[in-house]
Design a protein with these regions (language model features):
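S-adenosyl-L-methionine
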Residues: 130-167, 174
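Polybasic, low-complexity RNA-engagement segments
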Residues: 1-45, 63, 294-470
Length: 470
């Protein structure tokens, strides 16, 4: 049985008041968390369920929690399982970002907020998704590749590295490491790790993170500060510190409905903040504030300098070094080939200078479209290419898999192809959606699904129909 730390109970009750705290405690100890997903609008047209009110275009509450692991369309990136409170970032982006921007998600793993942000950003924007912890950065890269949008760069760096890089951003999301009080309901381990000392360590670290990244935010730029915790030390007090020490201004969001039951400032200060409390609002714990840096923001596409004196043709770029194979990608974008450790990428040409600056100064894990690996006998197509929204799938032979065969494929088991399947690389699909590659060598086919991504469970729940593809 869950037991909440006494220091947490005493402090939080004093902060929230008896009534609000009792609703929180009851939710943590007695209630099931709601199940919600967010669809990928670049791959998916709709989903079952009730719209999440602060993210109505892509967020959905589900009435039950299905076995998501056994839905091939989850692995194909058509949707992401995300608790509803975290989708509030969608509202912030849509309200404050009306023109193309360059944005940084500084502490992005596992990628839920990054993919939510990418879906909400105006076309022509570039998103850097960064995770400082090496072990967590790989799952971030995986989820970004499944999402499949080309205007994203994934890095594994500390804030100080970005400071040295001289890259400048219009918007920065700092979903900072925290004491995790908002995770108590769904993660009992978070309860065991909580302590007042950890809270103290966190609020100090959070200030260091914001301070380190502040110079990377352009004058007039937007900082979205968020935690998944409740205490004011990591929340309101840090927002107040950002205003006092760094000169930021707290901004309000319009259209936040009273029926959403989002709790506002609990410290008596008058700046607007947004706190999601389980048992009060329909989601897990989240705190968010929108801050504006002093100065005038200079409007315009972040890629405008890269477009000067460029020809307006749509041809795939070619030249010395790696090349992008003809026909692999949609040709409504000008592509620049790039290579790193035998892996070839296609970078949208408008980001050439920015990508080169990132590659020079940061540890780039993924950028644009990951095409494949060059072993000297031509490119072996990568899983990320199969899941990219830029894939020209009609260029490749395709085999539609049954549900059972799709699950076998995602377990990296052998899947037989029809006898008339051409030799070479074959795009396998499920419900007409690409899920990966096989190499047909005649008497058998090699499953090219990434070993580290495979489904490990032998259990199967049966075919799911949660979302509808484009």
């Amino acid at each position: 049985m869950k037991t909440l730390p006494e220091d947490f109970r005493t402090y939080t009750q004093a902060l929230m008041g008896e009534k609000l705290y009792q609703r929180l405690e009851h939710a943590i100890l007695e209630e099931e968390a709601p199940t919600s997903i967010r669809i990928n609008p670049f791959k998916c047209k709709d989903a079952d369920g009730e719209p999440v009110p602060w993210c109505p275009e892509t967020g959905r509450y589900l009435s039950t929690r299905p076995g998501f692991t056994f839905d091939p369309l989850l692995h194909a990136g058509l949707y992401y399982v995300q608790e509803a409170s975290s989708m509030f970032v969608d509202m912030a982006i849509r309200q404050y970002v009306k023109e193309p921007v360059m944005m940084l998600d500084l502490c992005a793993a596992p990628g839920g907020k990054s993919t939510a942000v990418r879906a909400a950003l105006p076309e022509g924007s570039l998103l850097f998704s960064n995770e400082p912890m090496r072990t967590r950065s790989q799952i971030l890269a995986e989820n970004v590749q499944k999402f499949g949008h080309p205007d994203m760069i994934v890095t594994n760096n500390y804030p100080r590295d970005y400071k040295k890089s001289k890259l400048q951003f219009d918007v920065i999301l700092t979903d900072v490491p925290c004491s995790g009080e908002g995770m108590f309901r769904k993660d009992e381990g978070a309860i065991g790790e909580w302590s007042t000392q950890n809270v103290n360590n966190c609020w100090q670290l959070q200030r260091e993170i914001v301070s380190d990244i502040w110079n990377c935010l352009k004058p007039g730029g937007i900082l979205i500060y968020s935690t998944c915790t409740f205490n004011a030390h990591e929340d309101e007090e840090n927002v107040d510190w950002i205003c006092e020490e760094l000169g930021a201004e707290v901004m309000a969001l319009e259209g936040v409905e009273d029926t959403w039951n989002i709790t506002r400032n609990l410290t008596g200060t008058d700046f607007p903040v947004y706190r999601f409390i389980p048992g009060v609002s329909r989601g897990e714990g989240l705190f968010m504030a929108i801050l504006k840096k002093e100065g005038e923001w200079e409007a315009g596409s972040p890629a405008k300098e890269n477009r000067k004196d460029k020809k307006k043709d749509k041809k795939v770029a070619k030249g010395k070094g790696p090349e992008i194979p003809d026909g692999w990608l949609k040709t409504d974008t000008e592509w620049m080939p790039a290579e790193s450790n035998e892996t070839v990428y296609a970078i949208p040409g408008r980001w050439k200078d920015i990508y080169n600056q990132a590659e020079k100064n940061l540890k780039v894990l993924h950028a644009g479209v990951k095409l494949g690996t060059d072993k000297g006998k031509g490119l072996i197509p990568d899983q990320a290419l199969a899941l990219s929204t830029m894939l020209n799938k009609d260029h490749f032979p395709q085999v539609e898999l049954s549900y059972d065969d799709a699950i076998r494929y995602l377990r990296k088991e052998a899947v037989n192809l029809p006898a008339d399947t051409p030799k070479g690389y074959v795009l396998v699909t499920y419900r007409q959606v690409p899920i990966g590659w096989e190499k047909n060598i005649g008497n058998r086919a090699n499953n090219l699904y990434p070993q580290e991504w495979k489904i490990k469970s032998s259990h199967v729940t049966g075919e799911l129909f949660i979302v509808n593809s484009l």
